[in-house]
Amino acid sequence: MTILINDSTLRDGQHAVKHQLTAAQLRSYATAADKTGVAIVEVGHGNGLGASSYQVGRAALSDEEMLTTVRESLQNSKMGVFMLPGWGTIADLTKALAYGTDVVRIGTHCTEATLAERHLGWLREQGAEAHAVLMMSHMASPAELADQAELLVGYGAQAVGIMDSAGSLLPQDVTARITAMRMQVKVPLIFHAHNNLGMAVANSLAAVQAGAGIIDGCARGFGAGAGNTQLEVLIPVLERLGFNTGIDLYHFLDAADLAARELMVVPPMIDSLGIVSGLAGVFSGFKSPVLNHAGSAGVDARDVFFELGRRQIIAGQEDLIVEVVAELKRAAS
């Protein structure tokens, strides 16, 4: 069985550097990744097309600059983009296709697949390759996710899947979710992990063994919070288990070394807040804003994460961090 690898280094990795990757960094990594045989190289603001903003962070480059830079660097791999309806629009998708995007992935909250209907339909009308993912998948049951996936396929998605956005799932949770989806839809299934509880590689293997055919990851795990699935670990493990990735290991190890040298300020690690984020079920990308607001207010950041988890906060609601910090400070005084 062939497993397609979606390399999210230049998109999810943006979270780790506050969306400040430069054109030179994008070009350097994309060129290296293109030599590996990886199927898709994903690029953009960490939150996707149209997301560069005060609320979730201004990117160093515009979407146009990011996409054109990477497009020029790819000869073999497809270029992928990610978009969340509400941040991105049909106008953003139009531009992305004009800049040479090969694969568009639309993301929604795990119970809000209907938000992707218009965008997926439009993409299919354009003849574009359209995928869709359900985010924060720990917040929905396997049956609910399968129903949502069926809706996405009905809207035109040619591959569907789930993101463990908070790094909260364990292998048995992944197996149950992918198995339920596999029984209900016939298109390829996608899995995207975060490593808050140290489960990213194990969860990705569980997804593949349950029937997923497209797996996300990043060189050196470079991504939000505790990072993503570390591709240079996952790839040889998949091959050892008898799955084909089509990726040259030495070339990918070289790309990962380059990423460590040129893209990262500090390598991803599972620190105390990463663990708390995973346990609380809060999006990994909240780490920096929680630290900033909690630190300035003298509030324990761990308490902030658990309260955000209790409220079931999702990506895009970063403004509520300020509210939670203020309430915790008042309660302590």
Curated annotation (Swiss-Prot):
Reactions catalysed according to its record: (S)-4-hydroxy-2-oxopentanoate = acetaldehyde + pyruvate
Site (Transition state stabilizer): R11
Domain Pyruvate carboxyltransferase, chain residue ranges per copy: 3-253
GO biological process, one term: L-leucine biosynthetic process
Record-level Gene Ontology MF annotations: 2-isopropylmalate synthase activity; 4-hydroxy-2-oxovalerate aldolase activity; manganese ion binding
Pathways per UniProt: Aromatic compound metabolism; 3-phenylpropanoate degradation
Domain of life: Bacteria
InterPro entries from the UniProt entry: 2-IPM_HCS-like, 4OH_2_O-val_aldolase, Aldolase_TIM, DmpG_comm, DRE_TIM_HOA, PYR_CT
SUPFAM superfamilies for the chain: Aldolase (SSF51569), post-HMGL domain-like (SSF89000)
UniProt: substrate binding residues: R11, D12, S165, H192
Residue numbers annotated as active site: H15
Positions of Mn(2+) binding: D12, H192, H194
Keywords: Aromatic hydrocarbons catabolism, Lyase, Manganese, Metal-binding
Enzyme Commission number(s) from the entry: 4.1.3.39
Record's function text: Catalyzes the retro-aldol cleavage of 4-hydroxy-2-oxopentanoate to pyruvate and acetaldehyde. Is involved in the meta-cleavage pathway for the degradation of aromatic compounds.
NCBIfam families: 4OH_2_O_val_ald (TIGR03217), PRK08195.1 (NF006049)
Record family assignment: Belongs to the 4-hydroxy-2-oxovalerate aldolase family.
Record note on quaternary structure: Interacts with MhpF.
The protein's name in its UniProt record: 4-hydroxy-2-oxovalerate aldolase
Organism for this UniProt entry: Serratia proteamaculans (strain 568)
